[in-house]
Amino acid sequence: MNRGKEWDWMDNKKDLLICFGTRPEWLKVKPLLNEIDNYKLLFTGQHKDLLKDIEVDYRIEIGDKTNRLDQIISDCLMQFPDGDFDVLVHGDTVSAFACALAAFSRKLKIIHLEAGLRSYDLKQPYPEEGYRQMISRIADINFPPTSISAQNLFNEKADGLSYVVGNSVLDNLI
């Protein structure tokens, strides 16, 4: 399903910027930290109480109206750190979309964890289904959790590479 492209993480010397802003995102990316040597953490601030237990390299200060999606996206675009790194986003949150969009605008490689999950109804769940589809379209590498989600990406002709990787939370529990 990779449309003839290849990617080798071991040959990559760039830092991986791991973006998260919610507790569910953190729980799903945390197991990866033991497997990756060269990473930096970017916190987007939806669940601010997370920071008391986690040291991050970058923090995006979102406005007081944190329930406004446009404000969160604007703050992420304006405050996204400069650097030559690959950017990992997880799932379908507004912070994942905003960080992917910021990376895309800076021509950075985007890696989408938990890609390809679909309802195919842009209004359910809203706005997450739209974020899922848009992130997968601009991602260079998609990591779907199942073969069904990988097939969704293939059917949509998503240009990025696709590797079925399972669910990091379930893998961590086993």
Region spans (language model):
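A nucleotide-sugar donor-handling region in carbohydrate enzymes
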Residues: 2-5, 44, 48, 63, ...
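Nucleotide-activated donor-dependent transferases that construct or modify glycoconjugates
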Residues: 4-22
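Glycine-rich phosphate-binding loop signature in dinucleotide/nucleotide-binding domains
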Residues: 11, 79-85
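Glycosyltransferase specificity loop/lid
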Residues: 16-79
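Short glycine/serine/threonine-rich phosphate/pyrophosphate-binding segments
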Residues: 25-30, 93-99, 150
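An aromatic- and histidine-rich active-site surface loop
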Residues: 88-106
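A short, histidine- and acid-enriched strand-loop-helix "catalytic/donor-clamping" loop
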Residues: 112-126, 140
